[in-house]
Swiss-Prot record:
Coiled coil: none annotated. Residues 126-163 are annotated as: LID. This is Adenylate kinase. It comes from Bacillus mycoides (strain KBAB4) (Bacillus weihenstephanensis). GO terms for biological process: AMP salvage. It comes from the Bacteria. The keyword Isomerase does not apply. Pathway: Purine metabolism; AMP biosynthesis via salvage pathway; AMP from ADP: step 1/1. InterPro entries: Adenyl_kin_sub, Adenylat/UMP-CMP_kin, Adenylat_kinase_CS, Adenylate_kinase_lid-dom, P-loop_NTPase. AMP binds at residues 31, 36, 57-59, 85-88, 92, 160, 171. Catalyzes the reversible transfer of the terminal phosphate group between ATP and AMP. Plays an important role in cellular energy homeostasis and in adenine nucleotide metabolism. Zn(2+) binds at residues 130, 133, 150, 153.
Length: 216
């Protein structure tokens, strides 16, 4: 099974990715992991990526796509993979189609975890972190026993500056605008599957499981 996982920040992508790879024993491939592995192995493309990252520049598409091609050609991807964080643009998605064709494979599903942006705002702005031990809480979903105090060490809880409402709302807006052309592209190809991410975590996975179970 060859899957792509999509979803806005706060949609619960990471949790679902963990459950998918655990059950189906396929590699979870994120852009960051691919870059790190290629740089560590000092492949030609890995060294090229490193030169851009070290300068704080964006890695060009041709380098990123080359690294993706190398990764998807590896033995552990024979039975399938879960791509996370790639592609980000229609140009990258088109390049991925070419890679899959060259490998004699195809993408089975693009799983988009759908959550209303208002709920995402609540999820993302409610996070609080302990200044002392780094424990994470959520005002609505996982509140501390005593307001603003860590249950574990008694430290003070704070909100990260990039978790404030205005910053989060802007981040979501940018993500929605960037993601829409990609979703349209995959809908046209017939790959796109929308998953209701507003349900309980286990119910979200149950819906994914029903969908992809036949591919195993």
């Amino acid at each position: 099974m060859n899957l792509i996982l999509m979803g806005l920040p706060g949609a619960g992508k990471g949790t679902q990715a963990e459950q998918i790879v655990a059950k189906y024993n396929i590699p979870h491939i994120s852009t960051g992991d691919m870059f790190r592995a290629a740089m560590k192995a000092e492949t030609e493309l890995g060294l090229q990526a490193k030169s851009f990252i070290d300068k704080g520049a964006l890695v060009p598409d041709e380098v990123t796509i080359g690294i993706v091609r190398e990764r998807l050609s590896q033995e552990d991807c024979i039975k399938g993979f879960l791509l996370d964080g790639f592609p980000r643009t229609v140009a990258q998605a088109s390049a991925l189609e070419e890679i899959m064709k060259d490998l004699g494979k195809k993408i089975d599903y693009v799983l988009n975890i759908n959550v209303d942006s208002g709920l995402l705002l609540t999820r993302l702005t409610g996070r609080r972190i302990c200044k002392e031990c780094g424990a994470t809480y959520h005002l609505e979903f996982n509140p501390p026993a005593k307001a603003d105090v860590c249950d574990k060490c008694g430290g003070e809880l704070y909100q990260r500056s990039d978790d404030n409402e205005e910053t989060v709302a802007n981040r979501l807006d940018v993500n929605i605008k960037q993601t829409k052309p990609l979703l349209d592209f995959y809908e046209e190809l017939g790959y796109l599957q929308s998953i209701n991410g507003e349900q309980d975590i286990n119910k979200v996975f149950a819906d994914i499981d029903v969908l992809i179970g036949g591919l195993a």
